[in-house]
């Protein structure tokens, strides 16, 4: 299963993440406490042996162009209502791999209806990967009855409040293509190798679980 460990800030964190994850991410141009500058991000992109996603809440093409040109990454993670025309321009101009986030409510009165609306939204976009999240890196879990329905139709990456203690059960229920974690594997605002190791072990247990 694809495992992305997001929100790295230092070469030391990158080194840990590379030992366990398939991809990582740097937070740029948003209000997150994990936000770093372009120079730091460029250094991490250059050092990395795995894909480094530039993560941002911007919907402005000019800002994405800055991110691409100043960091050198070819991987973008978009947490905004950016339109398809802008995405097409970025893909045609820069050839980037784009993962687009779609917001899932924390609790649903009607999971089937909510899933249907989100599926319709997803189908209005053409992107390389779909991310289901509770909303802009808030660190809260969402209603996994919805993501379970969506995961039967699309290859999705699951995010939102994942940690070593809950990821086994969530992966087992939702059966996503991949998972994306940040705060759930941190201790004192830094990536913790023991938490990352346990998280990845439990992802694999959930993936291989047979009813």
Swiss-Prot record:
Classification via Gene3D superfamilies: Aldolase class I
Keywords associated with the record: Amino-acid biosynthesis, Aromatic amino acid biosynthesis, Isomerase, Tryptophan biosynthesis
EC code: 5.3.1.24
Pathway per the UniProt entry: Amino-acid biosynthesis; L-tryptophan biosynthesis; L-tryptophan from chorismate: step 3/5
Pfam families: PRAI
Catalyzed reactions per annotation: N-(5-phospho-beta-D-ribosyl)anthranilate = 1-(2-carboxyphenylamino)-1-deoxy-D-ribulose 5-phosphate
InterPro entries xref list: Aldolase_TIM (IPR013785), PRAI_dom (IPR001240), RibuloseP-bd_barrel (IPR011060), TrpF_fam (IPR044643)
A GO molecular function held by the record: phosphoribosylanthranilate isomerase activity
Gene Ontology terms: biological process: L-tryptophan biosynthetic process
Family (UniProt): Belongs to the TrpF family.
HAMAP family attached to this UniProt entry: PRAI
Protein name: N-(5'-phosphoribosyl)anthranilate isomerase
Organism: Methanococcus maripaludis (strain C6 / ATCC BAA-1332)
């Amino acid at each position: 299963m694809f495992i992305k460990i997001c929100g790295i800030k230092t070469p030391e964190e990158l080194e840990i993440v590379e030992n366990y994850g398939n991809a990582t991410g740097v937070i740029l141009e948003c209000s997150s406490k994990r936000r770093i500058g372009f120079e730091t991000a460029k250094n991490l992109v250059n050092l990395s042996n795995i894909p480094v996603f530039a993560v941002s809440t911007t919907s402005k093409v000019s800002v994405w162009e800055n991110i691409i040109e100043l960091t050198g990454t070819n991987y973008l993670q978009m947490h905004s209502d950016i339109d398809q025309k802008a995405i097409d321009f970025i893909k045609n101009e820069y050839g980037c791999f784009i993962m687009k986030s779609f917001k899932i409510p924390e609790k649903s009165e009607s999971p089937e209806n909510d899933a249907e609306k989100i599926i319709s939204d997803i189908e209005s976009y053409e992107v390389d990967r779909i991310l289901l999240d509770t909303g802009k890196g808030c660190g809260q879990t969402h209603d996994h009855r919805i993501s379970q329905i969506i995961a039967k139709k699309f290859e999705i990456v699951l995010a939102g409040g994942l940690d070593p203690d809950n990821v086994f059960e969530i992966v087992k229920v939702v059966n996503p293509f991949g998972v994306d974690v940040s705060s759930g594997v941190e201790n004192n605002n830094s990536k913790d190798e023991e938490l990352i190791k346990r998280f990845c072990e439990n992802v694999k247990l959930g993936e291989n679980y047979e009813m």
